[in-house]
């Protein structure tokens, strides 16, 4: 996967993986043990933070629902997406597939096919939907064998190779495998706590619309950028979810958590035009 060398002042940025209050829990973890929801951030708050952090377009990829994303669907710089839980047919193995720029009919059709990864891949291919394998080396259910990963590389040319939720131990093999097989690498924060939105993102050449941005991704003109995950970020996210779940929400504490998160590196100013 060769670098596209996108000039920073000319690119368009999107955090291609983040969650709102609409997300459903998909796997037991510390949040479930503490009786916390999967996410407690309203879609409008995600949009506002993404824009403050320099994202040109915004999307929300909730687990198996587009209810949160539809609340922002009328905004011209927003596109509806979903993190689809997909199974290998007749096997106890699941993966998550990010489906971008979809509509309610696509959502329904994808849910109907979610029990068969081959059927999902055929649908997104036929519809021209940009779809990416999320966190490829995180085990959603049973571990994947090499044959599964090879097939996934064939079915989904786009992989999430930089996650703001998972660290180098899972991101590095995803990048190496994708480069060995060919294809496109993207990045997203996978933010559940509402404080790391926009700190991990995908950049393409300048796009004038969400459709053009996704067209660049489809064409391989995309670069992953930003933070990777670590224990501190996981602790911050879990605390933020818990605080948002309390009566009155995050309030000042949430603002303090968000203010401690590093900022996206600024775009350099354009060079002055010669006289």
Residue ranges and their predicted role:
Residues 1-36, 67-77, 86-107, 122, ...:
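Charged catalytic cores and adjacent phosphate/nucleic-acid-binding surfaces used
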Residues 16, 61, 82, 134, ...:
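Active-site flanking residues adjacent to catalytic metal/cofactor-binding acidic residues
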Residues 33-39, 44-64, 129-132:
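Divalent metal-dependent hydrolysis catalytic cores, especially in the metallo-beta-lactamase
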Residues 42-43, 113-117, 144-145, 170-171:
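Amphipathic coiled-coil/heptad-repeat helices and related helical stalk/stem segments
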Residues 47, 66, 118-121:
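Generic structural signal for well-ordered alpha-helices
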Residues 109-143:
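Internal catalytic-core helix/loop-beta-alpha segment
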